[in-house]
Amino acid sequence: VATRGLLPSRPALDERESLDSFLERLAIANGLSPPQVLRLLTAAEHSGSPGAAFMMIKPDPLIISRIARLTGVDGASVADATLLRFDDGLPLYLDGLDPLRRHTFRHVVTQGWFPQFGSQLCPLCLAEDGIWALEWRLPLAATCPRHGVFLTTHCIGCGHRFRTHRYSPLRLSSIPEK
């Protein structure tokens, strides 16, 4: 799939939504698999080939502009759907991280606790709208402010942490929304 402009179907990016959740909903809306969306985002062009490493933490500026171009969402909102929203030391400090240089991740994780991979979830929120909230990625988040329930950290079926995918920022397949 190759495109230079907007994708035909563009769901709105919810203000509390994480970028990977939005991109997976975008894939479903356009009949694409998450790997196809990633290829659209990282394909080489005259402006360069954006990297998807650290996309949920501190994304490559090229990938932010590519997402904005394909979705019509402004770049600031795209960046705000990543952990950059929580930068400036409260609760994260991402200054040492360069998304184009993998080894710089060490500068960030040595500061103490850090949400490396995965997410918690509020089962009630997810059942309502299928949107994965960015705040659920923060280890200090324990309850859902909307429902007043504890966040769930692991799948009761398989025992794994949710949204743990070290080698791809998106899940390999998405289940269509009801």
Please place each PLM-identified region on the residue numbering.
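Short alpha-helix boundary/capping motifs
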Residues: G51-M55, D95, C144, F150, ...
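Short, cysteine/histidine-rich loop/knuckle motifs that typically chelate Zn2+
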Residues: L121-C125, T143-R146, G157, K178
